[in-house]
């Protein structure tokens, strides 16, 4: 009995299952911004497909390791000031600094972990 066809079908099925959630693209905006102390700052992040709430927000200062600020889209990491907040689910997420402080000057970025390489 020739088993090549079922094996090929199984391979296609596994490929389809494993590929269903790969290559999630994240689009963050704005790419840069100018703001003053005391300003409310908002950054958005959009996923190319539904990632539920599997999103982190990080702060990185020059020469330093990234610091986790927000996990699961909206949960504040212990010790992070309450002026930082996150919201959203599915494909659209928002990160907010309610009142910008001088020490907040940094690079901020989102990271999805619904599907990791």
Curated annotation (Swiss-Prot):
It is found in: Secreted; Cell membrane. Residues 24-117 form the Ig-like domain. Residues 111-117 are annotated as: Complementarity-determining-3. Residues 72-78 are annotated as: Complementarity-determining-2. GO terms for molecular function: antigen binding; identical protein binding. GO terms for biological process: adaptive immune response; immune response. Residues 79-110 are annotated as: Framework-3. Residues 1-22 form the signal peptide. InterPro entries: Ig-like_dom, Ig-like_dom_sf, Ig-like_fold, Ig_sub, Ig_V-set, IgV_Light_Chain. The keyword Signal applies. Keywords: Adaptive immunity, Bence-Jones protein, Cell membrane, Disulfide bond, Immunity, Immunoglobulin, Immunoglobulin domain, Membrane, Secreted, Signal. The keyword Signal applies. Residues 46-56 are annotated as: Complementarity-determining-1. Disulfide bonds join 45-110. PROSITE patterns: IG_LIKE. One of its GO terms (cellular component) is immunoglobulin complex. Residues 23-45 are annotated as: Framework-1. V region of the variable domain of immunoglobulin light chains that participates in the antigen recognition. Immunoglobulins, also known as antibodies, are membrane-bound or secreted glycoproteins produced by B lymphocytes. In the recognition phase of humoral immunity, the membrane-bound immunoglobulins serve as receptors which, upon binding of a specific antigen, trigger the clonal expansion and differentiation of B lymphocytes into immunoglobulins-secreting plasma cells. Immunoglobulins are composed of two identical heavy chains and two identical light chains; disulfide-linked. PANTHER family: IMMUNOGLOBULIN LIGHT CHAIN. This is Immunoglobulin kappa variable 1-33.
């Amino acid at each position: 009995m020739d088993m090549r066809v079922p094996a090929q079908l199984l391979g296609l099925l596994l490929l389809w299952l494993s590929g269903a959630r790969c290559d999630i693209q994240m689009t963050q905006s704005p790419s840069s911004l100018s703001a003053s102390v005391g300003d409310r700052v908002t950054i958005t992040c959009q996923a190319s497909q539904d990632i539920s709430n599997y999103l982190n927000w990080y702060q990185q200062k020059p020469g330093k390791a990234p610091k986790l600020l927000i996990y699961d889209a909206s949960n504040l990491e212990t010790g992070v000031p309450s002026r930082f907040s996150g919201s959203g689910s599915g494909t659209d997420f928002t990160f907010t600094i309610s009142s910008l402080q001088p020490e907040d000057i940094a690079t901020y970025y989102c990271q999805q972990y619904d599907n990791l390489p």
